[in-house]
Amino acid sequence: MINFSLSLTKSMSYSFIWMLFVIHISCVLSADGNHILCSPSFTCGNQRGLLYPFWIAGRKECGHPDFELDCNAGVPELSISSVKFRILGADYDSGIITLARSDNIDDPCLPNSFTTSFNETVLPLASTTDLLTIYYDCNRNVSSFVSTFVKELDCPDDGTDDRRNYYLTRNLTFLPPSLKLEGNSFLLNDFGGSCSRNVSNPASRTALNTLESTPSTDNLKIALEDGFALEVNSDCRTCIDSKGACGFSQTSSRFVCYYRQEPQNPTRNKVILKLFFIVIYVLGIGAASFAMMGVILVVTCLNCLIRRQRKTLNDPRMRTSDDSRQQNLKALIPLKHYSYAQVTSITKSFAEVIGKGGFGTVYRGTLYDGRSVAVKVLKESQGNGEDFINEVASMSQTSHVNIVTLLGFCSEGYKRAIIYEFMENGSLDKFISSKKSSTMDWRELYGIALGVARGLEYLHHGCRTRIVHFDIKPQNVLLDDNLSPKVSDFGLAKLCERKESILSLMDTRGTIGYIAPEVFSRVYGRVSHKSDVYSYGMLVLDIIGARNKTSTEDTTSSTSSMYFPEWIYRDLEKAHNGKSIETAISNEEDEIAKKMTLVGLWCIQPWPLDRPAMNRVVEMMEGNLDALEVPPRPVLQQIPTATLQESSTFSEDISAYTEICSINVA
């Protein structure tokens, strides 16, 4: 019986050690295999020395999925949003890759070209790259102001004498002080609105400077032929510098760095093999006693670990940094702190769901004094809770009739919740997305829009620290019994000191349709509190759209109508011809509707410097209609569909990001 047990134990020991040996060898082969595959560069067409993020058949693990190359044309080409780009050069020592558009490299007058953009996380634009914008089929008559920025493009005659093509060589967001647009940017918007389309191409700043000093179609072709520079991803450069090979994991869908195993010495391998068999023999002889000793050792270690952990939990001097941060949070925020058990009791075990926000589910609850409250329970996957801390800190500093009141919070490890006042009427979207909007008159809608403006004005200008919301939309505007609006959900709010209002975002945040253009493209400038102004303008136009839903049904199916309500301008043109925005309303209501429309349109100007600040928006809403001018029709660059689809999920599931408040505002 003893011999049988010993033999069984010996057999199990052999199997276990052999399994460890096989697993180790397979892991080494896998790591070495990817490094061997991806470490050497490859040739595609006339280009040598290509590496990540580019790849060809047989090297899928070595490149990003968006950057597969086609080598059949003799030059390496890749397709992005149906636009082909060719590689002009790749210098991984300097970290610069040069590309050019294949469709207009020889002819900038192609009628079907359109704007596309790169995944700048993988290949960011180099600092030497700027944007060249070409406007097609525009009015011939150009003002003297506009002519200082745009030059005529000599394309084959299309048969019309009053239409021309033009190009713009500089990024208007970063003009020198001597060329400030001041109040004349609407002239450029009017010019862009007169064109049938415009296409933005990255280009070398040196070539654009030459084109600007010596305008000609030949120099324009040279600027397109020279292409534009992109930088190798910083993660990849770090990987290459550390003797690794850049690649992409199909399993985790993220960048990986493959490293090779150290070369083995043959003599050393023989010694290791002998030791391997000796260890097997020794373990086989003493397996029973070793097994018993192993069990005792494991039990002893586990017991020590458990006792040590209990001591750590009970000793305040041994608490983790997370516990310290949470204690500091509770001490700094002057709000009632609830335990998770109390939250469960308040919500009656989370019985009634009243909504789902970007970071969790909202439940109805009742405090011990009988007051109804809304309890927002965050998802347990929210990392270290930075967004939660941000929300509680920002909301605890606010006190305004148009800002939702925070009553308390819960923070126990990954269990986090906020408790705020309950609104019987729910959120604004339930009114403007249903037949309820037709029962609300223009005075009520105006009161809601004005209240939201006052709330945002308070966040931007009335707090000790400027609070930027970044997710203004109907779902985040709550209505009390008197239909007075209250701005809620500060889960996306970012705080800056009053004189440091320019924000830098690592992730796009917000809700598609309400996101300002500068969040998508640096062409429009930097992200700041003016992004909230844009979202507010879209909110106001959304309210007007709900009131005029029947007149817009023919446009709502269009994707572009999500981003700009063209029907608003058509109705304004009708108003100039004697027709009001909506029939069967009084003159007073007609004036209110027009005022809301004009304010909304001013707020959604594509250039942040053309949008009014929220304190000015309140003045416009409270002022006379006669003092408001019709703003120019915005001309937005085309936003690739893929970008929009990715961004539409950001407000629902987003990682923490870093805010840099680095530019002082006088």
From Swiss-Prot:
Extracellular topological domain residue ranges: 31-275
Pfam families in the cross-refs: GUB_WAK_bind, PK_Tyr_Ser-Thr, WAK_assoc
PROSITE patterns, alphabetized: PROTEIN_KINASE_ATP, PROTEIN_KINASE_DOM, PROTEIN_KINASE_ST
Key word Transferase present: yes
E.C. number(s) listed in UniProt: 2.7.11.1
Disulfide cross-links: none
Domain of life: Eukaryota
GO terms assigned for molecular function: ATP binding; polysaccharide binding; protein serine kinase activity; protein serine/threonine kinase activity
Residues making up the signal peptide according to the UniProt record: 1-30
Transmembrane portions of the chain: 276-296
EC primary class: transferase
Glycan attachment residues as annotated in the record: 119, 141, 171, 198
Spans within the Cytoplasmic topological domain: 297-666
Gene3D superfamilies to which the protein is assigned, alphabetical: Phosphorylase Kinase, domain 1, Transferase(Phosphotransferase) domain 1
Protein name (database record): LEAF RUST 10 DISEASE-RESISTANCE LOCUS RECEPTOR-LIKE PROTEIN KINASE-like 2.5
Organism: Arabidopsis thaliana (Mouse-ear cress)
